[in-house]
Amino acid sequence: MQQERDHKRDCCKLMPQTVKAFFKCLRFRRSSSSSSDMVKARARNEEKEEPSSIETSTRSLNVMRKGIRKQPVSSGKRGGVNDYDM
């Protein structure tokens, strides 16, 4: 246990002061974000979701088209069975 604590302290010492200050700034920004900022962020996220839903629907249509497409009739070269009557 003592060795793990010492190791954690060493890791923290390796991190420069500027990086620590940067993380503190990020934490402060997150905690200080007002409710109006949250509403704006939600509105932006909703706007971004609409095109993605359209993209997924077009993708699903493309997948369905591939499934509807008939498989080519085997020529019999590899031992396949022909669908048509001779």
Swiss-Prot record:
Judging by the UniProt lineage, the source's domain of life is Eukaryota
Q: Which family does it belong to?
A: Belongs to the brassicaceae elicitor peptide family.
Propiece residue ranges:
1-59
Q: Where is the composition biased (Basic and acidic residues)?
A: 39-51
Q: Where is the signal peptide, in residue numbers?
A: none
Annotated protein name in UniProt: Elicitor peptide 5
GO terms of biological process kind: innate immune response
What is the documented function of this protein? Elicitor of plant defense.
| Protein encoded by which gene | PEP5
Q: Where is this region: Disordered?
A: 31-86
State the UniProt keywords alphabetically.
Plant defense
- The site annotation (Required for ligand-receptor interaction) covers G76
One Pfam family per UniProt: Pep1_7
